[in-house]
């Protein structure tokens, strides 16, 4: 049976697989495109499964944002060459959009979400593995929602909403939403640059905090200072530590004469609260 070239091309467009695979599938399915699509999806998933033990260490971070909801995802591949491929970029942007639309709060939720014309997101990722020839892996997802305020965000990269590192900011206020968005974006850019470990001092891991204080106290003890002087030195060094790792205590990257908490207070809007943030860095362990 001679295959229609238009059917072969349509099959290639729908599956992303090669012309020879598409022609063979159509021949085996007596020209039935729907059956051929199912067959090629099976082939694609089988090819993807063979690559499952390989390491996906490159990739992209993508953001999808509306006024009161934002999501960041990380999709990994094996090389920068594939990370710059149009099909990979299209896939990662689609996944961010689906995660936002479905309000996914975890990687597993997104993997099980529906992906139009393919099945699930996980099947779309495995299909991408087959088409691009590298292992693809959805590794991280960050979700933020603000009921009384805005979600702002920033991703550092050449394309808007796409790069290697991104941040989401939740601001609570009844003030002007456009001004809140601008404040939030500036804080998100700060977070991307300074990579804080916690929102406030109270949010720091207590064991890590106690360990840091113990180290500083041991260092100061070796100075043989009077107890009152030693306490002031310890408090000063702890304050310096907070400035390094706590977002609200960090000096604002655009004006180091003020902390982030001061920058928020200095806005023309009243009662603005930074309630949460998320930072996603490509390749970083959770």
Swiss-Prot record:
It is found in: Cytoplasm. GO terms for molecular function: translation elongation factor activity. The keyword Protein biosynthesis applies. Keywords: Cytoplasm, Elongation factor, Protein biosynthesis. SUPFAM superfamilies: Elongation factor Ts (EF-Ts), dimerisation domain, UBA-like. Residues 79-82 are annotated as: Involved in Mg(2+) ion dislocation from EF-Tu. Disulfide bonds: none annotated. GO terms for cellular component: cytoplasm. Transmembrane segments: none annotated. Gene3D superfamilies: 1.10.286.20, DNA helicase RuvA subunit, C-terminal domain, Elongation factor Ts, dimerisation domain. Pfam families: EF_TS (PF00889). Belongs to the EF-Ts family. Associates with the EF-Tu.GDP complex and induces the exchange of GDP to GTP. It remains bound to the aminoacyl-tRNA.EF-Tu.GTP complex up to the GTP hydrolysis stage on the ribosome. This is Elongation factor Ts. It comes from Wolbachia pipientis wMel. The gene is tsf.
